């Protein structure tokens, strides 16, 4: 069965809630979470500091999962995202593996 990659961009304010939601799922063996700077032509929801800087501090979440885990994963994230909308996309993974060494990351 092929795997998929869920990528979600969320406000930093719900970062810990996202972590809690994913850790609670038995089917999720791990995920990546990074702080990013999000740029947009729509500045209407930026605060003054963000408008001056030209970007908003966000977090990027990545979860490698099987297609049959997708609904459960999205349901868990939906519960966290009620107050702060999250943009996401899911793409198929055509190849993956480990390079170098004998221990996976």
Feature-to-residue mapping (PLM):
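Positively charged, small/polar-rich N-terminal and surface patches that mediate targeting and assembly
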Residues: 1-105
């Amino acid at each position: 069965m092929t795997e998929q990659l869920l990528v979600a961009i969320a406000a930093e304010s719900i970062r810990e809630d996202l972590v809690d939601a994913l850790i609670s799922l038995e089917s999720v063996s791990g995920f990546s979470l990074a702080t990013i700077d999000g740029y947009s032509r729509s500045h209407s929801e930026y605060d003054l500091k963000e408008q001056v800087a030209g970007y908003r501090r966000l977090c990027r979440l990545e979860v490698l999962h099987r297609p049959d885990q997708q609904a459960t994963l999205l349901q868990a994230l939906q519960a966290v995202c009620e107050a702060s909308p999250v943009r996401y996309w899911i793409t198929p993974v055509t190849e993956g593996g480990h390079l170098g060494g004998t221990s996976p990351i």
